[in-house]
């Protein structure tokens, strides 16, 4: 049988191909920043704050996030409490969960670890998620932002940190509160 729809078939092949190439090119920049090396001074995050040669307007802080069934724990690595604080707990639907307080406008490099099974911390409002696998080093860049101009006033703005990888019976209750403030 003779193929009379060659132009249509070529269009069905070429147009999606061009679209995929364009989307790949367009998204390469943001993906590259998500996995930027903490040792790259040319990345948007700069060098670690407090290291020699860092730019105070372009630097990041290192924090630790540990997952275990069915709880999050945070380590602010001795940072000032106005930049990072993890000493409080709050009631969330009848469950006491940890509160991570972060300062707006700062960058955080979070070293992720898991003590038991695979977990996946998801910072809901920040749009970032990464797997925490036992025995495997993984990290996540966090740039806390506020949706309102005054960042929630004295209380700050809160968002949730949820686990998106099924990790057992109480997976649905594995949450933390992330509070972003600008004072």
Identify the meaning behind each predicted range.
Residues 1-183:
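Non-transmembrane, membrane-proximal soluble domains of secreted or membrane proteins
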């Amino acid at each position: 049988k003779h193929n009379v729809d060659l132009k249509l078939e070529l269009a069905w092949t070429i147009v999606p191909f061009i679209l995929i190439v364009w989307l790949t090119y367009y998204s390469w920049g943001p993906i590259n920043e998500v996995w930027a090396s903490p040792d790259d001074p040319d990345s948007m995050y700069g060098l670690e704050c407090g290291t020699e040669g860092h730019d105070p307007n372009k630097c990041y802080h290192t924090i630790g996030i540990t997952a275990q069934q069915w709880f999050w724990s945070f380590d602010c690595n001795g940072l000032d409490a106005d930049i990072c604080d993890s000493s409080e707990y709050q009631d969330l639907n009848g469950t006491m969960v940890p509160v991570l307080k972060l300062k707006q406008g700062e960058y955080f490099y979070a070293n992720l670890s898991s003590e038991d099974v695979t977990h996946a911390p998801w910072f809901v409002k920040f749009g970032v998620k990464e797997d925490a696998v036992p025995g495997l080093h993984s990290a996540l860049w966090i740039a806390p932002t506020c949706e309102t101009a005054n960042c929630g006033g004295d209380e700050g703005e809160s968002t949730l940190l949820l686990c998106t990888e099924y990790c057992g019976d109480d997976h649905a209750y594995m949450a933390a509160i992330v509070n972003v403030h600008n004072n």
